[in-house]
């Protein structure tokens, strides 16, 4: 057992093969009630992982036993952090400081935790530290979810804290800035890694505060970044808050009633069609939806290097077997403000939703959701960071959303199986975290062999060149036909038009 003194208390850690794992660091506390900013907690670590945050309902197509366990174990007091530190970092703290990886998990802003599937090695930092040969520190953490983490709207703006989950994440990056040197880490070499909601969160930190506040990381890995487009914060977003309050028995009574409500009331209310959940414009931290902020120049300009990736099939798992052209039109109408009829009609034409076509409904829906929620976010961040970015498509067995997480967190000793493709894949990411370049430390003595990975090609091209395609047989460079310029230009234009139409560009 190792005990480390931080400035606010003692932290205990267990050790596994030279990696000290300090779990359930009580980094943040919620002393003043719900939907407020958290603060550092002074309690000491007790060696357990700590409870996860209260989730929303399972996402269609992603039901999993681990989510059921999360629902049973979850508590409001959930803001804990796990630090995986190689022994050499603690023994040699006066010498070389190590790069730090901070993982932001996905789950649609409604599900997930830092140790959701820890038994299978998912989000277990021991393996990554060992694969990095002790040359990196890994941090994982919880953040508030569902209604408790992402309610927004004008009532929240006036009485509470919109995007509380995003503030929780920011507090962790501040903790890393303030304390990671005591664990042998280098606060100037922090990499933010995230998938799905985690990737969307990282993009939101890049545009937060109109891009004038340091997000506290220099490198980023953004995998399948998921973001909705809740533009109308005074209209549909506020109506979402009112509907939630009504279901919780607090209609017309403001946030004070919700803060006093029994947690079971809030959980039940969040399970009944909560609607869009995730980073939402609040007029303060997030000025606009991500694509609009990028177009307006509201982004942090001083990142050193990024890896951006998507899987072969992002949208497919979100399209039900009973989907119709009408239900896909309903997806657009429910995500855009009610006044955005022209934008919706334009997209209905673009995706052939008004009349049957030769393309199957499932294929249309998959493409629509892919573009709207995932890949056009990739095109948008690359508009500003193409000269510092590496682009990847993860394609083994025509991979669907989330499957690349298993490759990133691959643990050969825990899984009792060797998957060389996953080992090579990991080496790109760890090389990037340690050096800023995925090529420097990539595994060259492995089969299938890794290959040189150049930065992404001309951002003005319809298809992005130099995309590293990860397939069952290895790696190759392709032109990416899923992040199309014409498609994403259309989406960005329409989001700008709708934002302006609602009167939000001048707010």
From Swiss-Prot:
The keyword Secreted is annotated on this UniProt entry? yes
Per the record, the similarity remark reads:
Belongs to the type-B carboxylesterase/lipase family.
GO terms under cellular component: extracellular region
Q: Which SUPFAM superfamilies match?
A: alpha/beta-Hydrolases
Q: Which UniProt keywords apply?
A: Glycoprotein, Hydrolase, Lipid degradation, Lipid metabolism, Secreted, Signal
In the Enzyme Commission scheme, what number(s) does this protein have? 3.1.1.3
Alphabetized Gene3D superfamilies for the sequence:
alpha/beta hydrolase
Q: Which residues, if any, are the signal sequence?
A: 1-21
Enumerate the catalysed reactions: a triacylglycerol + H2O = a diacylglycerol + a fatty acid + H(+)
| Top-level taxon in the UniProt lineage | Eukaryota
Name of protein: Secreted lipase ARB_01498
Q: What class of enzyme is it?
A: hydrolase
InterPro entries per UniProt = AB_hydrolase_fold, CarbesteraseB
Tell me which Gene Ontology terms the entry assigns under biological process. Answer: lipid catabolic process
Tell me, in one coarse class, where this protein mainly resides: secreted
Top-down, what is the taxonomic lineage of the species of origin? Eukaryota, Fungi, Dikarya, Ascomycota, Pezizomycotina
Q: Does the keyword Hydrolase apply?
A: yes
Compartmental location:
Secreted
Q: Which organism is it from?
A: Arthroderma benhamiae (strain ATCC MYA-4681 / CBS 112371) (Trichophyton mentagrophytes)
What residues sit in the active site?
A: 196
């Amino acid at each position: 057992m190792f005990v480390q003194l931080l400035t606010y208390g003692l932290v205990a850690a267990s050790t596994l093969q030279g990696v000290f794992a300090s779990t359930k660091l009580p980094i943040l506390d919620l002393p003043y009630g719900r939907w407020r900013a958290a603060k550092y907690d002074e309690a000491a670590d007790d060696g357990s992982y700590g409870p996860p945050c209260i989730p929303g309902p399972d996402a269609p197509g992603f039901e999993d036993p681990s989510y059921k366990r999360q629902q049973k174990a979850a508590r409001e007091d959930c803001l804990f952090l796990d630090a995986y530190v190689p022994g050499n970092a603690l023994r040699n703290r006066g010498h070389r400081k190590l790069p730090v990886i901070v993982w932001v998990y996905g789950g649609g802003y409604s599900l997930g935790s830092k140790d959701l599937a820890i038994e299978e090695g998912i989000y277990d930092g021991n393996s990554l530290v060992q694969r990095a040969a002790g040359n990196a520190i890994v941090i994982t953490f919880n953040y508030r979810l569902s209604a408790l983490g992402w309610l927004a709207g004008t009532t929240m703006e006036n009485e509470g804290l919109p995007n509380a989950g995003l503030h929780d994440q920011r507090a962790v990056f501040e903790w890393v800035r303030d304390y990671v040197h005591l664990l042998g880490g280098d606060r100037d070499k922090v990499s933010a890694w995230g998938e799905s909601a985690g990737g969307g969160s990282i993009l939101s930190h890049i545009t937060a505060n109109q891009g004038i506040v340091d997000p506290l990381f220099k490198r980023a890995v953004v995998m399948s970044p998921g973001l909705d487009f809740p533009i109308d914060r005074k209209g549909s977003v506020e109506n979402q808050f009112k509907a939630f309050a009504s279901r919780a028995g607090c209609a017309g009574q403001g946030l004070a009633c919700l803060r006093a409500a029994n947690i079971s009331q809030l959980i039940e209310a969040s399970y009944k069609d909560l609607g869009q959940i995730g980073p939402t414009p609040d007029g303060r931290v997030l000025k606009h939806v991500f694509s609009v902020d990028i177009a307006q120049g509201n982004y942090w300009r001083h990142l050193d290097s990024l890896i951006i990736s998507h899987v072969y099939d992002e949208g497919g798992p979100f399209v039900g077997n009973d989907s119709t052209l009408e239900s896909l039109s309903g997806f657009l109408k429910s995500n855009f403000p009610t006044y955005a009829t022209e934008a919706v009609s334009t997209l209905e034409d673009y995706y052939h939703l008004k009349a049957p076509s030769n393309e199957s409904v499932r294929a249309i829906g998959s493409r629509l959701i892919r573009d709207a929620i995932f890949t056009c976010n990739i095109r948008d961040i690359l508009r500003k960071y193409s000269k510092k970015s590496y682009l990847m498509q993860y394609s083994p067995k025509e991979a669907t959303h989330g499957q690349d997480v298993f490759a990133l967190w691959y643990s050969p000793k825990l899984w009792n199986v060797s998957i060389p493709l996953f080992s090579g894949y990991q080496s790109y990411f760890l090389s990037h975290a340690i050096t800023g370049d995925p090529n420097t430390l990539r595994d060259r003595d492995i089969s299938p062999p890794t290959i040189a990975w150049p930065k992404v090609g001309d951002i003005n091209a319809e298809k992005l060149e130099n995309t590293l395609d990860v397939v069952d047989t290895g790696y190759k460079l392709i032109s990416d036909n899923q992040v199309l310029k014409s498609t994403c230009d259309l989406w960005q234009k329409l989001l700008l038009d709708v934002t302006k139409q609602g009167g939000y560009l001048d707010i």
